C-alpha cells in the first residue's frame, strides 16, 4: 500500500508501528525568536484501545490546569480526536526527558484529584460529560508504563 505524504505530521506517522504509552516530539514551529514544540503524549495503543470520551475530557481538564503549576512554557493541551492521547504545545521547550518529568508530576496530581477543575456550565462546554474515576484509571495506566515513555516504536 502506497501512502500519500500528508500535510499533518501525525497522518505521516505509521500508527501500526508505535507502542503506547510514549512521549515524542511531533513537530516544531520556529518563529522569529521563539520555537513552539508539539508533543505527542500517547496513552493508549492506536487502533486497539481508545479512552472513553468522559474520562478523556476529565483528563484534559486536569492536565491542562495542573501542568501549568510546573511550567510557564505550556501553550496548549489538546485531546486527540482518535482518543488515544493528547498533544501538548510548549514554548522553547525541546526536551522529551523534561516533558516526561512534567507529565509524570501532572499525572500524579490527577491521581490525587478530588474534583474536576472548571466542571461547570460557565467554564466548560459539556460540563456533565466527565469521569474522574476513569481519568484516574488512565493516569495510573500511563504512569505504570513510565519506564517506556521514550520507546516510541516497538
UniProtKB/Swiss-Prot annotation:
Gene name for this UniProt entry: luxS
Subunit and partners: Homodimer.
Function: Involved in the synthesis of autoinducer 2 (AI-2) which is secreted by bacteria and is used to communicate both the cell density and the metabolic potential of the environment. The regulation of gene expression in response to changes in cell density is called quorum sensing. Catalyzes the transformation of S-ribosylhomocysteine (RHC) to homocysteine (HC) and 4,5-dihydroxy-2,3-pentadione (DPD).
Organism of provenance: Exiguobacterium sibiricum (strain DSM 17290 / CCUG 55495 / CIP 109462 / JCM 13490 / 255-15)
Keywords attached to this entry: Autoinducer synthesis, Iron, Lyase, Metal-binding, Quorum sensing
Name of this protein: S-ribosylhomocysteine lyase
Organism superkingdom: Bacteria
Entry keyword Cell division: no
EC number(s) stated in the UniProt entry for this protein: 4.4.1.21
Cofactor annotation comment: Binds 1 Fe cation per subunit.
GO biological process: quorum sensing
